[in-house]
């Protein structure tokens, strides 16, 4: 009660791009016991999405998988401790270009963005993959199928803060509702496009009705 929860400090440039400084605060002191209780409240085959803002995310991934949960990782922010997790057993991995390079390390040196998906496919053949590329769009891959591209929905950016979180949240919600990966990504692209037209993070996330009303 005497300490602050997590804070994110964001600087926005004139063209809407951002730089982010994250302070975990009490988020970094959540106990393993409380996290496991949350997982125990889920039912088998439920989808659980993890980022990397809690202690021992790698251990939490393993615990979720042991409980039969479809586990999605959106490693924001990335750090090397995540490589200890059984990532090859994830249901889905959602990464931007920087995060993808973190997972691939030396393999990605000198590789253009277009080649990152092929490297991710080779490393995680049984995982649904999403590689977001900002204003360029996103690549997706379902295990056993060819990768595909979902173009970004073009909108005038005011503030890109929260666009990645909006994309990931809408994509995972669509998957949980039974939609296929391509459909989920198209919905997420529309949602994130709306979000960049507004200032702020959580306040910029559109309602579902707004996303459904957006004609592209």
Region spans (language model):
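Ribokinase/PfkB-type carbohydrate-kinase core domain
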Residues: 10-148, 210
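A glycine-rich helix N-cap at a beta->alpha junction
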Residues: 1-2
């Amino acid at each position: 009660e005497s300490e602050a929860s997590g804070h994110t400090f964001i600087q926005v440039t004139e063209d809407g791009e951002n730089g982010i400084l994250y302070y975990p605060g009490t988020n970094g002191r959540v106990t393993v016991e409380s996290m496991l209780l949350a997982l125990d409240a889920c039912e088998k085959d439920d989808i659980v999405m993890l980022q990397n803002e809690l202690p021992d995310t790698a251990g939490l991934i393993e615990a979720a998988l042991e409980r039969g949960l479809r586990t999605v990782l959106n490693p924001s922010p990335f750090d090397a401790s995540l490589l200890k997790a059984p990532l090859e057993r994830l249901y889905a991995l959602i990464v931007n270009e920087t995060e993808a390079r973190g997972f691939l390390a030396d393999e990605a040196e000198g590789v253009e963005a277009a080649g990152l998906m092929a490297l991710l496919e080779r490393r995680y053949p049984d995982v649904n993959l999403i590689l977001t590329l900002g204003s360029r769009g996103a690549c997706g891959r379902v295990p056993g199928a060819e990768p595909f591209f979902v173009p970004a929905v073009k909108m005038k950016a005011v503030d890109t803060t929260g666009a990645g979180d909006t994309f990931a949240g809408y994509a995972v919600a669509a998957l949980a509702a039974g939609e296929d990966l391509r459909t989920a990504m198209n919905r997420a692209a529309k949602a994130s496009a709306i979000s960049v037209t507004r200032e702020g993070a959580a306040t910029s996330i559109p309602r579902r009705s707004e996303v459904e009303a957006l004609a592209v």
